[in-house]
Curated annotation (Swiss-Prot):
Belongs to the ABC transporter superfamily. Its EC number is 7.-.-.-. ATP 2 binds at G346, T347, N348, G349, S350, G351, K352, S353. InterPro entries: AAA+_ATPase, ABC_transporter-like_ATP-bd, ABC_transporter-like_CS, ABC_transpr_CbiO/EcfA_su, ECF_ABC_transporter_ATP-bd, P-loop_NTPase. Transmembrane segments: none annotated. ATP 1 binds at G44, P45, T46, G47, C48, G49, K50, S51. GO terms for cellular component: ATP-binding cassette (ABC) transporter complex. It comes from Methanosarcina mazei (strain ATCC BAA-159 / DSM 3647 / Goe1 / Go1 / JCM 11833 / OCM 88) (Methanosarcina frisia). It holds the Pfam family ABC_tran. This is Putative ABC transporter ATP-binding protein MM_1996. Keywords: ATP-binding, Cell membrane, Membrane, Nucleotide-binding, Repeat, Translocase, Transport. It is found in: Cell membrane. CDD domains: ABC_cobalt_CbiO_domain1. GO terms for molecular function: ATP binding; ATP hydrolysis activity; ATPase-coupled transmembrane transporter activity.
Amino acid sequence: MNQNRGSTIIEIRDLWYTYPGRAETTLKGIDLKIKEGEFVLLTGPTGCGKSTLLKTLNGIIPHESEGIFSGSIKISGIETVDSGQMELSKKAGLVFQSPDDQIFSTTVEDEVAFGPENLCMEREEIDKKVDDALKMVGMSGHRLDSTNSLSGGQKQRVCIASMLAMMPEILAMDEPVSQMDPAGTQEILNTVRELNRKQNITILLVEHRIHEIAPFADRVVIMDSGKIILDQPASKAFENLEVFHRLGLRVPEPVELCHTLGIKASPFSAEETFPLLNTGNFKEKIGDYPASPGRKEKTSSPGWSSENNEPLVSVRDLWSGYDKSRMVLKGINLEIHRGERVAVMGTNGSGKSTLLLNLAAMLRPYKGNVKIFGEDTKTKNPYSFAGRIGFVFQNPDLMLFCDSTEEEAKFGPARLKLDNIEERAKISLEAMSILNLRKDLPQSLSRGQRLRTAVASILSIDPILVLLDEPTTGQDRVNIEQMMDYFKTRGSTLVFCTHDIEIAMLYATRILVMNEGQIIADGRGRDVIKDIDILRKASLTQPPVVEIASYLGIDAFSITELVDGLIHRNPEIRIAEGIKC
């Protein structure tokens, strides 16, 4: 916690805003004060207005928007409505939700130097600021790289560096680590916390991945339907779990576990949880540990048997990249069978997105071959797979060009001359919970809603093979589970890239782990998650509940399994009523 808090640096009063083309008001009477040096986590369901609120801090709204705006926003005592964006940008730096919306330079160096150059700094000072900023985000070795060659997580690092080079008083960050691997996320968050503590920079960070940000935050603010409904110190916020549950927000696993077991505490890590399990009567109830494993529960997504099942996708010795001198994939061998749900995980830049592009026939192998439905992608026109493969890019905006979400869902079926276009569009929009937005302009929606629009646009063609690149980005827990449940219920063949190991464990029948262009693990989630060496190589970490279960000597991979194991060991344990494990 930063002890150097000063006067109020952000003051928002009765803020209202409605986007052009939207019937519903996005921000509804927001009142918020943030003191200098605070680290504030802003969260809430997808589409509740978080990103819009951030855009008001540096004047993007209302100066670059034609929407309906009213209210007052003061940054360091300056009214944003009366100030130019150049002046505001010196005080409030904004890291966008999508790095592709922010990056416009051709090289990493030019992107990071742009801000200091516009502040008319000397060349020597600019070079030092670029060096320092890239070092802080772990991108020093990429200074001369093309921004187009970077992975999504690397682009996010560059966007953060471009703001750090200007050292603003306020750093407003919109899901800045959503495309980073877990190790990279912790690295960046540690850097941000150091800046908060040592430089007294005020941090306002929007994120759905509450479990990763909560340990760093002084304060938690929750929005819903354009309003602030909870504003409390981080140490107190999780005493109101019913609010998180009602809104479908993911609570840190240790907090959920302690609440389930009736322990009055809100630990954010496995390490903080261990001492709580050693206290008083609770230790007597769960017995001495480690002990013999508790009851072994079946996994949420059992392993897949490929016996007597011809592969839908067959990859042999695949070498692929965007430049012959720099291969991204190096000797990939892989089979995917009908009905499998395969999670692809690994470090940023390990080749996950490149693998998906090859499976979509959008890239052709430099060496080796990829066969989809038995057809070699080297000899087939990519358009021949249209209607059979549904692909959603990491950045959904690359796919959205129609004037409404309904038109997006109709576009594919219309081009393919399919029947029942209206019904197909309705079903796909309904499946993604955006039927109520069918007349809305996609560009006016939140990133999570835009991503679900992109998914709906491929569901309407009913593809045989579904490929999703980071489908959990910008999504709250309810929408993630609803999307993945849809594919699970339909028995879809699904390959999805993700850094979310909990979602991979819950929904994937199989997990591939990649590192430096190669598959280093391929198996059931339970088996992969136990291999600490593999996880370390891929910059992945075990979920806290798995660490806690191991500490207790129980073979469990979810809170439900862990609690069942504890009850099996000692039936006298009482579970808090009404808690959803």
